[in-house]
Amino acid sequence: MWNTLTGERYRRLRGHRGIINDIACTRAGNGCFASASDDGRVLFWDAESRYPVDSLEFGYPITCIEFSDDASLLFVGGVDNAIHAMDLATKNRQYSLLGHKDTVSSLALSHAGTRLVSSGLDDSVRVWDVQPFAAAIPAQQPGAPQKSARLIRTLDGMASGFESLLIKARWSPDDEFVACGSADHTLNVWKYVNKHPSGCIFRLTV
């Protein structure tokens, strides 16, 4: 951790046994945040503590995380190709978002707190409904198809292939656009309009 005013390191936090892939902060601004790692764990931290205050164990590398708007859930993506909504009060999986065919590389909650965008190494960007009472396939339901009733849209129009892997997706401040960076040095941008599918409207190259 660094002091943003002085640029000096404030604190070094230890606890993970593998590469740390992502960090997510709660929107409450209370100094609580979580970290995801290749060691298969998500650790929870308080800014005033040097050591984790809680953890979630998954047993496989976790690549991305994001808190729900009220911080009651943590969305977790990893190498199992799924996004799991973990209830932080019970530590149980509330539901899973199924559809990606490869590792989930990033998660981002809309500013309204109702939509989650995910990017994956399957060359897809997906938008999900994460409102509390949206329809969902239960995480443990036998024979459930590999998709989720919460999937709103799959955004298309980007390049595909190993050199074009999608790394990070984010919402614009007004939730009207979705942008995703790619390994081929390009930024793909979509105009997101509810109920009206749209392809990539432009691509920026660095």
Positions of predicted regions on the chain:
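WD40/WD-repeat beta-propeller blade N-cap
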Residues: 14-20, 56-62, 98-104, 146-148, ...
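Short loop/turn segments immediately following beta-strands, especially the blade-tip
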Residues: 129-146, 191-195
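Loop/turn-rich, solvent-exposed surfaces of beta-rich toroidal or solenoidal domains
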Residues: 160-192
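WD40-repeat beta-propellers
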Residues: 1-3, 42-46, 83-87, 125-130, ...
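Conserved strand-to-loop turn within each blade of WD40 beta-propeller repeats
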Residues: 35-39, 70, 77-80, 119-122, ...
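A short beta-strand motif characteristic of beta-propeller blades
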Residues: 8-13, 51-55, 92-97, 153-159, ...
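Loop/turn segments within WD40 beta-propeller blades
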Residues: 24-30, 66-71, 108-114, 170-175, ...
